[in-house]
A protein has these predicted regions:
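Conserved short S/T/G-enriched processing/targeting/catalytic segments and their helical context
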Residues: 1-105, 127-130
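Conserved phosphate-donor
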Residues: 100-123
C-alpha cells in the first residue's frame, strides 16, 4: 500500500511518499523511481498502478503552470482545461487509458498534485478535489 502525504500551508506545499512497491505475489521491492516527482514545476505524487506515474515521469512534460493567478478558480480552470486533458492524452497515446466507447475515461492510479502552492487530489476518473 502506498502512502503519499501532502500538506498545504499559506504559500507553501510539502509532499512525501514511501519508497516500497509490492508485486501481486506480495514480494516487496524498493522502487528505482520515486512516488513524488517534479515535472515542469508541477509536483506529482502517485499511488495505485505504477505505470501511471512512470508515464508522467518519463517521456512527458507537464504543461507549465500559470505564473500568476488571481483566484484559485483560475487555477481550477487550468487543471480542468489544460493539465488534465494533456495528462489523459498522454495516457491514451501510451495505451494506459483504454475504454470501451460506452464507458467513461479511467486509469488505475490516484495522484496528489501540487501547483502554485495548491494541492489537488486527482482520482482515477480524472475528477479532482482541492
Amino acid at each position: 500500500m502506498t502512502t503519499v502525504v501532502a500538506i498545504q500551508g499559506p504559500g507553501w506545499v510539502v509532499m512525501a511518499a514511501d519508497s516500497q512497491s509490492t508485486y501481486w505475489d506480495s514480494r516487496k521491492v524498493l522502487m528505482s523511481n520515486g512516488k513524488v516527482i517534479n515535472n515542469n514545476g508541477v509536483l506529482i505524487g502517485g499511488a495505485g498502478q505504477g505505470r501511471g506515474l512512470d508515464l508522467l515521469q518519463r517521456g512527458w512534460v507537464a504543461p507549465k503552470p500559470p505564473k500568476r493567478v488571481k483566484t484559485v478558480d483560475q487555477l481550477d480552470d487550468w487543471m480542468s482545461k489544460i493539465f488534465i486533458p494533456a495528462m489523459r492524452d498522454h495516457f491514451v497515446e501510451q495505451g494506459y487509458d483504454m475504454k470501451p466507447d460506452d464507458s467513461f475515461a479511467k486509469h488505475e492510479s490516484a495522484f496528489v498534485i501540487a501547483v502554485n502552492n495548491t494541492l489537488y487530489l486527482l482520482d482515477e476518473d480524472y475528477s479532482y478535489d482541492r
